[in-house]
Amino acid sequence: MACNFEVTGITSDFATHRSRKVCANAGFSDKFLIFVAMRRFIALIFALCIATFAAAEGIKAPKIIAGPYIQACSQSEFTVVWQTDCDAVSWVEVAPDDGTHFYNTAREQFFHTIHGRRVVGRWHKVKVTGLDAGTSYRYRVLNKAVLLNPKNDRLYYSEGKGSDVYRRKPYLMRTLSDKAQTVRFAMGNDFHDKPEVLEQLFSKEIITPKKYDFVLYNGDMVSILASEEQLVQSVIAPSVAQFATQVPLYIARGNHETRGEHAVAFYDYFPTSTGQSYYTISHGGVFFIVLDGGEDKPDNDIEYYDLVRFDNYRKQEAEWLKEVVNSPECKNARARVVIIHIPPSSSGWHGEAEIARLFIPILNSANIDLMLCGHIHEYRFSEAGDAICGSNFPIVCNPNRARMDVEVGTDKIVYKITNANAEEITNEISIK
């Protein structure tokens, strides 16, 4: 097999001159010095050729060890996230759900890129764009392992390998749509590293695309975010095993996701439409505002080791919220739902009080129908006008390790809470 190389940065004149200077006193001729230099050069090239060939031949195709799962789904796009066992370049192929075989024709490809350059790594985030609202699409994920030669900036690839669409059906998902008559989603929170309970309450027998439009985790899915492995084992892997390859998953950060050595990387695994921990979702004429309440204690509390600045973060978020509630999407929605992990309380802990001070006055002007929270590890329903919360809309706190099924109809919002013991709470709220 021929090996072609492009060698740069070698100055043969310098090498010959140096050899001539060192050996001149020994009486060697210029021809002999040139011969020695060329022999060394050829030996070097041969060694590089053998090493490169061996390395390239030894690259194994990557394996997917986490994911894929759907993030940041909207009416025209969604993002697919997954992890491979080695550095790779990645892409997603997408086909309409039109009854043809996936191999019927070349499918549109979308690549993991940043500023125009393909990303080499183990985590892959591919945004699929230009889609139709309320439409089902099939997709597959593909990878090629990469070996980098840093001196020459060369890449050597393994054979490409993708999710199986020959023996198995491709992954299937559906975009959101404002034309949906009813919105159905499931919410969970405060599982605190209990993947077995998560899989029980959000099993694939329960969470299906026909029953649910999306799933939302409302914070504290882990207790302290110490490592990537913990996040995968406690949240990502059980979600993928049950529903997340085909039902969109959204995340609202809780105060416990802000803690731990790996906390700053949390949204590397859960990209959002805004690139921030706060964002919006629009589906079926319902406008969702997902907020981040930050930590529950003051920034200077000894528990945070001087690593947090959530007071300023919440102020920035409040400025964003002012723009959001005045947007046409919010004003023209038939219903408005706010998601935040920590509930507001003017007399509560610092985080609760700051949420009440900064967010509630803005939301009170936005005709909000319902706020959904977690954090307190028990069920609580606060009526509109509650003096402690200060809101002119009802607030529901979902218990820890429970699933809340929410259905937004034409004139009311119905929710049912189910815990691991199959105990249920049901209630309904009129839409303004």
Model-based region annotation:
Residues 186-189, 214-220, 248-255, 337-341, ...:
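Active-site neighborhood of phospho(di)ester-bond hydrolases with catalytic His/Asp-centered motifs
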Residues 181-258:
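Conserved, compact domain cores that house catalytic/ligand-binding motifs in diverse enzymes
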